[in-house]
Amino acid sequence: MSIQPDLLKAVLQPLLSAGHNASAAGISDALASMMSVNADVHMCHPFGDIKGPSAWFKACFEPLLLAMPDLERRELVVVAGTTEAGQHWVGTCGNYMGKFVAPWMGIVPTGRLAYMRYHEFYRIEDGEVVEVQAIWDIPELMMQAQQWPMAPQLGDSLCTPSPMTQDGLRTQDDFVGQGAQTQAHVLTMLNDMCKHPSQGGPEVMNLSTYWHPRFNWYGPAGIGVGRGEQGFRDWHQIPFLRAMPDRALDPSGLTSHWVAQGNYVCETGWPNMR
């Protein structure tokens, strides 16, 4: 049974509101009010799996707030819906921002405004969050502190902006369509992309069919931003395929949860890439 997307988003409202002017008490109370005490939280390395809102706050948010006492959470896109399997998910992306004044996870503070992109997904049952799958772009913060230990990224560095259309935070009534056509478009695109290189040259991907000629690809830190089809290929896809030419949409042993609204599609899984 599907649930209206706006009702799903409302479950997250305590956190979204507390993030405007974050404090330890505000974030802690927000998580406690919207999450099951037994919620499974799957965080990126080095945090790993965490049980419950209190432990999540202690492991992740409390140290971040000590490093950035004026922390704020800036949502860019929030998408909600029910998957084909009947699960209810809310997907969010945005930037954590604040003045970086104290060390965090061994990263030396800059004393300046810093930002860290996040992608967080929340599974909801009976009006509360029962699972979280989240990635914080910690390398992005390392680069701002000039503490990146690996090779320079090929793409550009940029604090990810909101969509040009400025409609990533719309309510359900404002979205045009239910997203099914958009999701089908994305899935077809991914299938075509996986035809290269095993089934032919770059032309078999039909990239111009799916992408605007002036699109931006906002890769994670370590890869960076590319402009247009050529930028995507030069700074991400070609180096990626040289390293992992056998990547494919292989569902074996992996999970994938898709929801879409209007022109927006989000997908998560833990794990969902091999």
Model-derived segments and spans:
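C-terminal and inter-domain tail/linker signature
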Residues: 1-274
